[in-house]
């Protein structure tokens, strides 16, 4: 045992205590993942050493054969996972093994529901890593020394996972980290050579460095025909394939191997939704292995959270989270790139304005969109699952990626008046295929909620004529539509914003009936404008309504109601919006208003109709007290 000095006891960060408790209770049905997590970390440590040694070869300390070793001590009831990777110094041990240095941590804990299955999935997304050791261990001892440090700079970390840990200085001749798990009494099944070999084969076959286990000496024996079978000396042997999975031919890699590799790079517990493995040759050469997760990570909307792909150059790990190879609207994509063209000393700054980077980014973006198109075409139910998780992120695409705007638009899904449901399952291609003869626009409405969109008076004329309207109620929709102007050469038109042009969908008989109705209430618009004054830009008759007496419409050159709400919610200054007040000349209330000779009552009715229309469109009023007063006055008059 190493000499121990300068020993200190520290308390775990509160979040670590919570995570340890959650893991022990939520992951007990999948205990063996502890080995996957620890072997995965050991492989990452080897990758990091290989990268650092590119600029400082002495870090290898004469030992460049990187590997992970698993050993068992049945008498002590322990397993040890050791690596000769980058290692840690005292400060790193305290930071990495005592805290969770991850943005969005509090958000993660607030999302936990108490439902074991859901929580275990969420914990998997969070990435439990090292702490998974406590699923099976009652005590964990970590000994580590950073590559390049003296043997006297070793550090030992010990904990029973119950609130605190001790850290001490030790002598450690070899660089790297060894983790010893003292197994709980009911977990001793893991202190078995064949059990560990089967777990490594199941979860870690794809790890690109060898995972070694000790094979005992096999004495000389007699063969079936009496010949002597020579003795085999004891030795360390690799129990995994130890080749970089992404360099292998697609036909040689099983679905199970792809799934386990995804879990290795993403630390997700769930299988991916779909993946794409490609070898690109020609002007730019690289391998890519891209995965679309089945579930959105809890921190997808956290601006501080890094997103991106693992980057390798000539099979040497360079960095995690290389965001330059994927547009922001595809930030949920996991995977890796292995380039033959980038320099080994590449940095994030070099990647920023690099032609090779741009070519790879374009290629990877195209691959992901093609993957999604295939899923949407071949398995609509699976695609709806994807849309429920990532639809709002994909809606950022048309604004960010002009080159692929049409492709992204084809992947979008919306609710529609075609279905009596808030399910977003109508594609733009579906809509276009159902367009009426003479229809040249794609009509849509944006609102605070599906219910508000569905019950908007602006839909009335479309229902009457049987014209489909897309119902949009996500916060991102208004912003999306400001960047999405057409699809399949059909332009979009908001039914609440600007003039309503039904083009050839308006028949001559309808137009004549409209003109006749307007004659019956001639002069009304001028009287109403006099009452409302500067509150409105214009008062006019409309035929977009069939059941409602009036509506307000945002000016075609100004902001829509939803955009104003978005900007106000973001604390942005918003110019005063002027609306057009539109009256339905065929409605009995409007006819009654035209016949009203008492100017005071006329004013009150006008204000009430305007406020009703504003309430329907905006969801609130600037002066609700005045609305209530006018309404009460009119009700009292009617009651007399």
UniProtKB/Swiss-Prot annotation:
Residues 1-348 are annotated as: A. The lineage of its organism: Bacteria, Pseudomonadati, Pseudomonadota, Gammaproteobacteria, Alteromonadales. Homodimer. InterPro entries: HATPase_C_sf (IPR036890), Heat_shock_protein_90_CS (IPR019805), HSP90_C (IPR037196), Hsp90_fam (IPR001404), Hsp90_N (IPR020575), Ribosomal_Su5_D2-typ_SF (IPR020568). This is Chaperone protein HtpG. Residues 566-640 are annotated as: C. Residues 349-565 are annotated as: B. It is found in: Cytoplasm. Its main location: cytoplasm. Disulfide bonds: none annotated. Keywords: ATP-binding, Chaperone, Cytoplasm, Nucleotide-binding, Stress response. SMART domains: HATPase_c. It comes from the Bacteria. Belongs to the heat shock protein 90 family. GO terms for cellular component: cytoplasm. GO terms for molecular function: ATP binding; ATP hydrolysis activity; ATP-dependent protein folding chaperone; unfolded protein binding.
